[in-house]
UniProtKB/Swiss-Prot annotation:
Its main location: secreted. This is Chitin-binding domain protein cbd-1. The keyword Secreted applies. GO terms for cellular component: cell periphery; extracellular region. It comes from Caenorhabditis elegans. Glycans are attached at residues 327, 1016, 1304. Residues 28-83, 96-141, 190-236, 304-357, 566-614, 689-745, 782-838, 883-942, 1029-1081, 1105-1163, 1179-1237, 1242-1298 form the Chitin-binding type-2 domain. The gene is cbd-1. In unfertilized oocytes, maintains egg-1 and egg-2 at the plasma membrane together with chitin synthase chs-1 and kinase mbk-2. Essential for the formation of a continuous and cohesive chitin layer following fertilization. One of its GO terms (biological process) is eggshell formation.
């Protein structure tokens, strides 16, 4: 018991931080070459040395043990620590030495050969060998007390093995080992650990790596067939990524490397030039400063070299952390949530293809021998458990090589195999727990095992436990050990605690079938050792998907976000960054060769457009200097140089071994423009850093902006107000824009610098070139709305336009052949749009009201083409009172086509807008968000829909394009008035707007525009044309769209465009202007009737059918207590709506209010725990019970825990479940013995799955589950409807009209008042 206890203690003290270890002195005896075992230190001492493959590591015994012979034994059992009883205490040097207040260790009593060893508060005398004295400074025995040798960093002295071997893997030793010195020197190791931290380092992608410990180097080897992966710090079958990787340098000064010179320092001064040179290396750093008065000051300092500037080290393929060298120091960086670090691009990206989950098929394919198939041979096998087979692996030999003939499996030299037994006495005892203390990828805490990396997931790692199992049986979580126990005929098993080594989510849940071979091998075939590590390894049953390319799996499903990114990057053929605004944390990287990523900056950094990289000081005015672009060093990947063209600066990105450097302009102003008043202040103001240098602490505004500066002890931090709020420096708070003095007089200025494409072509934000826009570069949609107020803005001469609402942009399109006119804020004919007239007349490549005109530079032959944008002010044409988007729309939710954007209108005003979740779009037929595959095709064809549910087909109305298919109008102004002429077919036309006039016509206010054309030479032809083109009846009206204000009325002069008055829309069904709340109702009913007559009835009833049938007009109702959803009724139509975040609907106020103000939303943090036992019964219940969870005999759902003889109560299971103490989980009552009747009620269940109403409580009902009743409860405010077997409103169940318990769910009063509706 004593040796085993000492062994376990030694293991804990060696591998954990609370162990006491002393660095071995150079005078201590080193380990012989390739020797494995223990070497004792001083007499009666806890310190000793462990030799692993000739490498020495210091170790200590536990507090109450000392090292004697070959093991740690108690102090009392060590002969070296015994005290002579005949010795008088007064004469002993340690009699007066007090160890009670000292830590365990060795203490000197003077320059003598005796010293004191304090163990557990007791003093024990120990002696050095003859002619040696104890040296207090070195803590060992030496020839003199003043002898102190200097440490060296050379490899330790190695002794040659003796004549006698150390035995085989069984641990048996032929004889005692005697160390014999040898004059032969080992091979020198060509690796220097000076200045490196303790750890493992690789010298290329091979099987050799080096371990540094205390500036000492140790050469190590990986198993055959594997190489050392520096990123994973373990031996693997291949190297994933070349390391190190360099990325964009964060240096703020020009870095140069001086030539090595005989002189240690060099200084240069100049009276005319002010220069500063920084050299991050061990050599001298020279700084020269020259004043204006020709006074020269030279300061020379020396800074140690820590790392190469910009060097990046990753932590593996699918890791979110990485290290980056910045300012000659290594800094740890963390990627944001849902992003991983991609080493090849040196950035944090979303949707990394290499780390996407793989779908495992239901029936995995099995492979044994034969040609390659679609099943990948992978070392990370998750379903295989190897069957034990005697002598199927080759043995390892640690002694001298055998020169005789070898039959069967030959011996292999394994430098990382640790023998189970060591030399010396007590060889018949098994002792675990000794392992190498040096950090090694193959180190293990269990002696006598083959040390494998955690990445080999074939269940070979064992823990100590009771030996049990059968030689040929694989059952449960047992697995065999790879060690010398296979020397005998029976393989042994140990219980595994695999969940501590490999979490459950890293393993497949699939169970092996009854006829499947657990290891996937054919036992009748010969087994080769290379099958485990070599290329001839047979394929197993686990499926890993199709082969992976360099950048990811081809078969993995591309997410909707990645698909949108690929679409945005289609037009770019050179590396380009797409930003979402200035100092935003996310951006898009387009490589130009198909590798596109949605990326994000590390935590604490934002993307700086001026630097085209992530920065911690985005927005700080500073001088831009040389930027180093990351390189990719690869043996099999080489491509010509490519160029990143952004903001007028060309950056050369080379994919070869040599990095390139691009010199940016010398001033920050060349990258910046005058920002608009909404977001970012003008750069003419003081920089952020200078602002805080004047005022050490406080909050300062940046003009009329949502961002502001927080100065703290001279350091500047850029912060941002909440949504739609601006910072007011006078009140030191974020408030509305109209309350900020700085926003009162500022006007619109130019837009910021944007990312321009590589080719001189115009393109919109979505990456699709526009056919109707001149060749120029435009501002992206997102940036356009970030710097202007809400409203509608054109995209040049185009049918598409932008709708800005609270800095959110949505792209819309005019109907038919109409183009958007920003001046009138409406869709008109092409010849009536000012931008289109300018585009037709202008022959240059510039168009007014656009942001930039692209002018190609004239580079030399050796330089790439650079596009320098000329800054032009952006002046949006915004009317004083812009027309709201919802002016001509009915109340409710609206969307365009199958986009994910939707907005809510109420009384002709825009209430709110939003976007569906990723991968979903707005479906007008259900008035909600659905996946794109579930949206019907008809809904995608509609440009504008109503708020009523059930609209799944187009309305029967004529469009303007159908009315004017063969007639196009033009107007010429004569002396006395307009002259009506007509031109047929596709004759080119021009228009001149005639004067508008209003005619009172009942409820309509008419805005008339005549459609005329020029005169022809022949009056006969004109009359024929009039008779041919006149197809309308005088007095008839034609709708232009569905429920819009504009319509056409036929007159003698032709079709005249008219407008309904504000608040009314033209109804195509009644052919007149009606209130907007009732527009299209009859047409919708007719369409639904036609649809019902031609299509079968839906299988399921509408969710809110009949709930608004009793409501006349409009009303809102709550659907539950503390619910963020509520029901809006509008003329019998119901619609479920959602409050904004952190708000719930109040039935008293009939509006959404803050959740904290509702008392019903206050929920206790900890659920109440049933108290079944008093303090007197606690000891009685846990008497004789082991620690664990138990079921309460009084309540099957209660959970009790016994720990240390004390009773603890836990929250109970649900009322319908019972606690199963065998599984430790809540289970069905019929599976728990003694709880079969728990949760059941009286009554009979004739049919499984049927529902039974409760006779006494309308809110309670029962569900039949295999002959038993399960109690269920309806939500608050609803009762059970036995006719429909659903929870329904109380009004729908006559027998339960007044039994709803929730008073807040009453209908309340209607908010509709017809008298005050304004129609």
């Amino acid at each position: 018991m004593g040796p085993q206890l000492a062994t376990v203690s030694l293991l804990l003290l060696t591998f954990f931080s609370n162990s006491i270890q002393y660095p071995h002195s150079p005078a201590a005896t080193e380990c012989p070459a390739y020797f494995n075992g223990n070497i004792a230190g001083n007499a009666c001492s806890r310190e000793y040395s462990i030799c692993v493959n000739g490498v020495r590591q210091a170790a200590t015994c536990s507090d109450d043990s000392v090292f004697y012979e070959d093991e740690c034994v108690p102090v009392d059992e060590s002969p070296e620590c015994r005290v002579d009883e005949n010795t008088e205490e007064d004469d002993t040097p340690y009699a007066e030495f007090d160890c009670t207040s000292k830590q365990d260790g060795i203490y000197s009593i003077g320059c003598s050969n005796q010293f004191i060893s304090c163990v557990a508060g007791g003093a024990y005398m120990a002696k050095c060998p003859d002619s040696l004295v104890f040296n207090e400074r070195t803590q060992d025995c030496r020839e003199s007390c003043d002898e102190v040798k200097q440490d060296t960093t050379t490899a330790p002295q190695v002794y040659e093995d003796g004549e006698e071997g150390y035995g085989e893997a069984s641990g048996e030793i032929a004889g005692d080992y005697e160390r014999q010195p040898s004059n032969e020197q080992p091979d020198s190791i060509d690796f220097d650990c000076n200045g490196l931290e303790d750890g493992n380092y690789a010298d290329g992608c091979n099987d050799v790596f080096y371990s540094c410990s205390n500036n000492m180097v140790f050469q190590r080897y990986c198993p055959p067939g594997t190489v050392f992966n520096i990123n994973q710090q373990s031996c693997d079958f291949q190297c994933t990524t070349d390391d190190p990787t360099t990325t964009v340098s964060y240096s703020t000064s020009t870095i140069t490397t001086p030539q090595e010179d005989d002189s240690e320092y060099s200084s240069t001064t100049s009276a005319d030039v002010i220069s500063t040179t920084t050299t991050p290396s061990i050599d001298a750093i020279e700084t020269t400063t020259t004043g204006f008065d020709a006074v020269t000051t030279t300061t020379t300092t020396q800074t140690p070299f820590v790392c190469q500037e910009g060097q990046v080290n990753s932590f593996g393929m699918c890791s979110s952390r990485f290290n980056r060298c910045q300012n000659n120091s290594v800094r740890s960086k963390q990627c944001p949530v849902n992003t991983l670090f991609e080493s090849s691009l040196v950035m944090c990206v979303f949707d990394l293809p290499q780390c996407q989950p793989i779908t495992v098929p239901a029936a995995p394919a099995y492979n044994s021998y034969g040609p390659p198939s679609d099943t990948i041979v992978s070392p990370f096998d998750e379903n295989v458990r190897l069957k034990p087979k005697f002598d199927r692996r080759r043995k390892y030999h640690h002694g001298k090589p055998s020169y005789g003939p070898v039959n069967g499996n030959s011996y292999l030299e394994n430098p990382f195999f640790i023998p189970r037994h060591r030399g010396g006495s007590h060889r018949d005892h098994r002792r675990y727990g000794y392992g190498p203390a040096i950090d090694s990828p193959f180190s293990t805490a269990f002696r006598g095992r083959a040390a494998l990396s955690d990445q080999f997931k074939d269940y070979r790692r064992a823990r100590m436990g009771k030996i049990q199992g059968d030689a040929r049986k694989v059952d449960g979580n047992k697995r065999f050990l790879i060690d010398d126990e296979f020397e005998g005929p029976n393989a042994k098993f140990v219980e595994s605690n695999i969940e501590q080594v490999f979490p459950k989510n890293r393993h497949s849940k699939k169970q092996l079938g009854p006829h499947e071979d657990p290891d996937g091998y054919d036992d009748e075939k010969t087994f080769d050792a290379k099958d485990l590590f070599g290329a001839t390894r047979r394929k197993r049953s686990a499926y890993y998907g199709t082969e992976q390319s360099v950048y990811g799996q081809q078969s993995a499903q591309i997410s909707a976000r990645q698909a949108q990114v690929n679409k945005d990057c289609q037009q770019y053929t050179t590396p380009t960054f797409l930003t979402f605004g200035d100092c935003f944390d996310q951006f898009i990287f387009c490589s130009g060769n198909g590798i596109n990523r949605m990326a994000a900056c590390p935590i604490g950094e934002t993307f700086d457009k001026t630097l085209r990289s992530c920065s911690e000081t985005c927005g700080v005015s500073t001088t831009i200097v040389a930027v180093t672009i990351g390189t990719q060093t690869s043996d099999d990947l080489s491509a010509p140089s490519e160029y990143i063209e952004n903001d007028g600066v060309t950056t050369q990105s080379t994919w070869n071994d040599q990095p390139s450097t691009t010199q940016a302009p010398n001033s920050y102003e060349s990258y910046t423009t005058q920002y608009s008043s909404n977001d970012v202040p003008s750069t003419s103001a003081a920089p952020i850093g200078d602002r805080c240098s004047l005022d050490a602490s406080g909050l300062f505004s940046l003009g009329c902006s949502q961002k502001y500066i927080q100065c703290s002890n001279g350091a500047a931090i850029v912060r941002r107000c909440g949504e739609s709020l601006y910072f007011n420096e006078a009140t030191q708070e974020c408030t509305y824009r109209d309350e900020v003095p700085e926003c009162g007089s500022q006007g619109s200025t130019s837009s910021p610098v944007i990312t321009t494409p590589g080719q001189d072509q115009s393109s919109n934000y979505y990456g699709i070139p526009s056919d109707d826009v001149p060749s120029t570069t435009q501002t992206p949609v997102g940036d356009r709305c970030a710097y202007v107020a809400s409203g509608l803005f054109d995209l040049g001469c185009s049918q598409k336009y932008i709708q800005c609402s609270d800095s959110a942009a949505s792209v819309r399109e005019c109907e038919g052949s109409l183009y958007f006119d920003e001046r009138s804020q409406s869709c008109r004919f092409r010849d009536e749009v000012f931008k289109c007239q300018t585009a037709d007349v202008s022959s240059s490549s510039t168009v007014p009201y656009l942001d930039f005109t692209t002018t190609p530079a004239s580079p030399s032959e050796d330089e790439p083409t650079t596009y320098e944008p000329s800054v032009a002010p952006y002046i949006p044409s915004v009317t004083v009172n812009p027309v709201d988007t919802c002016t001509s729309l009915s109340d409710g939710t609206h969307g365009t086509g199958c986009s994910s954007f939707y907005f809510v209108c109420s009384h002709g005003r825009l209430i709110s807008s939003g976007n569906c979740q990723l991968g979903e779009g707005y479906d007008p037929s259900v008035q909600g968000c659905r996946t794109f595959s579930e949206i019907p095709a008809r809904a995608c064809d509609e440009q504008e829909v109503t708020t009523d549910a059930g609209l799944v087909q187009l309305m029967p109305y004529k469009t303007l394009e159908e009315v004017l298919t063969t007639t196009e109008a033009a107007t010429t102004v004569a002396n006395d008035g307009p002259t009506d002429t007509y031109i047929t077919g596709s004759t080119k036309y021009s228009t001149t707007d005639s004067g508008e006039y209003t005619i009172p016509y009942g409820d309509e206010t008419t805005s008339t525009r005549s459609y005329d054309r020029a005169d022809n030479d022949s009056e006969d032809e004109e009359e024929d044309d009039v008779e041919h083109d006149q197809k309308c009846t005088v007095g008839s009206r034609t709708p232009v769209g569905f429920c819009v204000r504009t319509y056409l009325e036929c007159t003698d002069a032709g079709n005249v465009e008219k407008l309904c008055r504000i608040g009314k829309l033209f109804d195509s069904h009644s052919n007149r202007c009606v209130p907007r709340i009732g527009c299209g109702k009859e047409a919708i009913r007719d369409a639904i009737k036609d649809m019902i007559a031609t299509t079968p009835a839906p299988a399921q009833p509408k969710q809110f059918e009949g709930r608004c049938a009793h409501v006349d007009g409009e009303a809102v109702f709550s659907i539950g207590v503390c619910s963020s959803k509520y029901l809006r009724c509008s003329y019998g139509a119901s619609k479920l709506q959602q409050c904004s975040e952190d708000r719930v609907f109040s039935n008293d106020k009939l509006e959404c209010i803050v959740r904290e103000s509702v008392s019903a939303c206050t929920v206790p943090k900890n659920p109440s725990i049933k108290k079944y036992y008093t303090s007197n019964d606690q000891s009685a219940f846990c008497d004789g019970k082991e620690d664990g969870l138990y079921r309460n005999e009084r309540d099957c759902s209660a959970i009790l825990q016994c720990f240390g003889g004390e009773l603890f109560e836990h929250p109970s299971c649900q009322s319908s479940l019972a606690f199963n103490q065998l599984t430790g989980k809540c289970d069905y009552p019929q599976k728990v013995s003694g709880c079969e009747n728990h949760g059941q009620t009286n009554g009979e269940c004739s049919e499984h799955g049927s529902f039974i109403a409760d006779a006494n409580n309308c809110e309670v009902f029962y569900r039949c589950v295999w002959g038993r009743k399960v109690v269920m409860t309806c939500p608050s405010g609803t009762v059970f409807n036995p006719l429909l077997s659903v929870c329904d409103w109380p009004s729908a169940v006559p027998s339960c009209s007044g039994q709803a318990s929730d008073s807040n769910s009453s209908y309340g009063s209607s908010t509709y008042n017809d008298d005050k509706s304004g129609y």
